[in-house]
């Protein structure tokens, strides 16, 4: 399988994990020991990262129905490493009623090809995408 295609397949799995509220499906896209530098949350490293991410997602999915749209600007391959960047648009609809919110973040993901041939995220970084202000 082409490497760019394989990363796109993994990103589809990531998106569908959010869209079905399946924390395990989302976490499956990450390497067993990855670094999570998500905006607004403490950084997580190594073996601690998957468990903390899973717990965060389980809480999120318990409180909200989620719909994720991924906008990939580029996927860049470099041997057994790759990175991709773009935007995530996450729609949060409260399960107990209330106003739906849209959160748009910029992201950068570093990927590594595993011995199995699958691509997994080894570092995740995101931050809020703020509108440009004209001076």
Residue ranges and their predicted role:
Residues 95-102, 131-135:
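A short acidic/glycine-rich loop-to-helix N-cap element
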Residues 2-12, 23-78, 87, 99-102:
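A solvent-exposed, acidic/Ser-Thr-rich amphipathic alpha-helical stretch
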Residues 77-80, 115-117:
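Short strand-connecting beta-turns/loops that link adjacent beta-strands
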Residues 87-88, 125:
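A mature extracytoplasmic/lumenal domain signature
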Residues 90-94, 111:
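Beta-strand elements of well-folded, non-transmembrane domains
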Residues 104-132:
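Short beta-strand edge/turn micro-motifs at domain boundaries
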């Amino acid at each position: 399988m082409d490497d760019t295609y394989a990363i796109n397949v993994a990103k589809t799995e990531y998106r569908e994990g959010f869209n079905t509220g399946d924390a395990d499906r989302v976490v499956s896209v990450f390497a067993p020991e990855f670094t999570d530098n998500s905006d607004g949350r403490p950084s997580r490293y190594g073996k601690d990262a998957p468990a903390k991410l899973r717990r965060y997602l389980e809480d999120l999915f318990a409180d909200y129905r989620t719909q994720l749209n991924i906008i990939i600007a580029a996927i860049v391959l470099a041997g057994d490493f790759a990175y991709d960047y773009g935007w995530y648009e996450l729609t949060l609809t409260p399960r107990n009623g209330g106003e739906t919110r849209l959160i748009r973040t910029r992201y950068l993901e570093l990927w590594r090809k595993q011995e199995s041939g699958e691509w997994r995220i080894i570092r995740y970084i995101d931050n809020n995408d703020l509108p440009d202000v004209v001076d």
